[in-house]
């Protein structure tokens, strides 16, 4: 009994496989009518034909005859010429359709169809799009949304017309697919995150496209977006340049302060004096004409960007040179400049003095060692001279006594 059941199951599987393999693929848009022709059937009654279908509406093969009638007529019915008519195909109509007909000469003809349905969604859109991105850190570009597709299809992102590959060069994509419980249509969402490179394109172009799950259907593309890319500027890159150098001028002179910020787009520049903001419009240049005592103090510039915190430069000191006085050597930025140079020269001078003292001490030690070595040599010479003198004195005495 079990063997017979297994054989029957295999026969059913093989019959279904044969139907699918030899079937003609038919694609129909959801909601539109579909007509399947029964090959070999007489165009007029009497007809000997039979339609069998296995779809989402049936648990097994459903048989339809030309006589028709019943609730199935609203779903599918046999036309007088033997064709099968579906007034409005839906997702449940996907499956296998087979027609077996015999002509008036008794020749049997079979027709096999594999029906697939589809629904093209509306044009996808990018929602929650960013107007500005920050270089060097992950940013959300936006979310691409496609609603009402069947099959689900896929969403893809593009940068300047070229496909973006997730998990490469700071690109990540978070996808979500939902299916409507009643219509069976799909809604796709794709969230794009990128890390723009420093020094890259300041206005990249992003777009998203929907590709249907069926061949021979063109992709649908969103309208492009062009967010700006802003590069955060480290504090040390906000430079304050003062003219004349040093910031010391005679009364009535002019001082020009320039705040240099190598960032795109350029941030707003505000000015501060002695830690208090100056009531001036944003400008990268501050000119102080006809310097007076009231203009003396410490100045700095603050670079402010819409999506970033303010960044302040180091301070520069502005002072007045009175007649007969020399300007301060340290009208420099944050105690640097000439003050730093003087400190470096002082350190080098100290090191040179120490080296000179060490050289003198070593020279004196060498002189002392040389004198200590010469002292014993002089003592030996004196002893030799004394011995010679003693030997010469007896000889002189003998020569004197032995005279005539």
From Swiss-Prot:
This is Advanced glycosylation end product-specific receptor. GO terms for molecular function: advanced glycation end-product receptor activity; amyloid-beta binding; DNA binding; histone binding; identical protein binding; laminin receptor activity; molecular adaptor activity; protein-containing complex binding. Disulfide bonds join 38-99, 144-208. Constitutive homodimer; disulfide-linked. Forms homooligomers. Interacts with S100A1 and APP. Interacts with S100B, S100A12 and S100A14. Interacts with TIRAP. Interacts with HMGB1. Interacts with LGP2; this interaction plays an important role in AGER-mediated pro-inflammatory responses and cytokine release. Interacts with double-strand break repair protein MRE11 which is a core component of the MRN complex. The interaction enhances MRE11 endonuclease activity and promotes DNA repair. Keywords: Cell membrane, Cell projection, Disulfide bond, DNA damage, DNA repair, DNA replication, DNA-binding, Endosome, Glycoprotein, Immunoglobulin domain, Inflammatory response, Membrane, Nucleus, Phagocytosis, Phosphoprotein, Receptor, Repeat, RNA-binding, Secreted, Signal, Transmembrane, Transmembrane helix, Ubl conjugation. Residues 124-221, 227-317 form the Ig-like C2-type domain. The modification Phosphoserine is found at residue 391. Residues 23-116 form the Ig-like V-type domain. It holds the Pfam family Ig_3. Its main location: membrane. The gene is AGER. Changing residue 374 to R: Less monoubiquitinated product and resistant to degradation. Residues 23-342 are extracellular. The keyword Repeat applies. Endothelial cells. Increased expression in pre-term labor and preeclampsia placentas compared to controls. Residues 1-22 form the signal peptide.
């Amino acid at each position: 009994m079990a063997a017979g059941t297994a054989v029957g199951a295999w026969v059913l599987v093989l019959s279904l496989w044969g139907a699918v393999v030899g079937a003609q693929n038919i694609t129909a848009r959801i909601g539109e009518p579909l007509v399947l022709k029964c090959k070999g059937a007489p165009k007029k009654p009497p007809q000997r034909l039979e339609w069998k279908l296995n779809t989402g509406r049936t648990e097994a093969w459903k048989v339809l005859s030309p006589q028709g009638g019943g609730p199935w007529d609203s779903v599918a019915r046999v036309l007088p010429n033997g064709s099968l008519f579906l007034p409005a195909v839906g997702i449940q109509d996907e499956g296998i359709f087979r027609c077996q007909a015999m002509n008036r000469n008794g020749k049997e003809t079979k027709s096999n169809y594999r029906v697939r349905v589809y629904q093209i969604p509306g044009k996808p859109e990018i929602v929650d799009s960013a107007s500005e991105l920050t270089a060097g850190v992950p940013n959300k570009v936006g979310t691409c949304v496609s609603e009402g597709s069947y099959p689900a299809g896929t969403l893809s992102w593009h940068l300047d017309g070229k496909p973006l590959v997730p998990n490469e060069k700071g690109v990540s994509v978070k996808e979500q697919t939902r299916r409507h419980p009643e219509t069976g249509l799909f809604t796709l969402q794709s969230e794009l995150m990128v890390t723009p490179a420093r020094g890259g394109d300041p206005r990249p172009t992003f777009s998203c496209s929907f590709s249907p799950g069926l061949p021979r259907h063109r992709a649908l593309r969103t309208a492009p977006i062009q967010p700006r890319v802003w590069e955060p500027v480290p504090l040390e890159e906000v430079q304050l340049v003062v003219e004349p150098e040093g910031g010391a001028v005679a009364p009535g002179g002019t001082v020009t302060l320039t705040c240099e910020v190598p960032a795109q787009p350029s941030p707003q520049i505000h000015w501060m004096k002695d830690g208090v903001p100056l009531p001036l419009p944003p400008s990268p240049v501050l000119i102080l004409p006809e310097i007076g005592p009231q203009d003396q103090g410490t100045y700095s510039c603050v670079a402010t960007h819409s999506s970033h915190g303010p960044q302040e430069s180091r301070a520069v000191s502005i002072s007045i040179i009175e007649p007969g006085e020399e300007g301060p050597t340290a009208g420099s930025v944050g105690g640097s400049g000439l003050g730093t140079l003087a400190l470096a020269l002082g350190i080098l001078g100290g090191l040179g003095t120490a080296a000179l003292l060490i050289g003198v001490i070593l020279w004196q030690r060498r002189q002392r060692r040389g004198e200590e070595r010469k002292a014993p040599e002089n003592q030996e010479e004196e002893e030799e001279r004394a011995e010679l003198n003693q030997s010469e004195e007896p000889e002189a005495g003998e020569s004197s006594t032995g005279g005539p």
